[in-house]
Amino acid sequence: MKVTCVLVVLLLLLPYGDLLGNSVCDFGSCVHNGCYCEEHRPCCTPGSCSSWWPRCPGSMMDP
């Protein structure tokens, strides 16, 4: 029963990936931690984006 609960919790957290924001966006794509990037703009650096703050400096926050 304990193992089942742990597996369920892990499966629920899996889509959020890096809560610490260690992933970097590629141009024009979204990565598993929910970081959004526009196609022709610079993307985020490690630590600037996480599932809690999904927009990066130099991408969709720009005018």
Curated annotation (Swiss-Prot):
- Please give one Gene Ontology molecular function term for this protein: toxin activity
What UniProt keywords are attached to this protein's entry?
Answer: Disulfide bond, Neurotoxin, Secreted, Signal, Toxin
Q: Which cysteines are joined by disulfide bonds?
A: none
Q: Which residues form the signal peptide?
A: 1-21
Please give an example of a GO cellular component term from this record. extracellular region
UniProt note on tissues of expression: Expressed by the venom duct.
* PTM entry text: Contains 4 disulfide bonds.
Subcellular location as annotated: Secreted
Present the record's domain note: The cysteine framework is XII (C-C-C-C-CC-C-C).
Q: What is this protein called?
A: Conotoxin Cal12.5
> From which source organism is this entry?
Californiconus californicus (California cone)
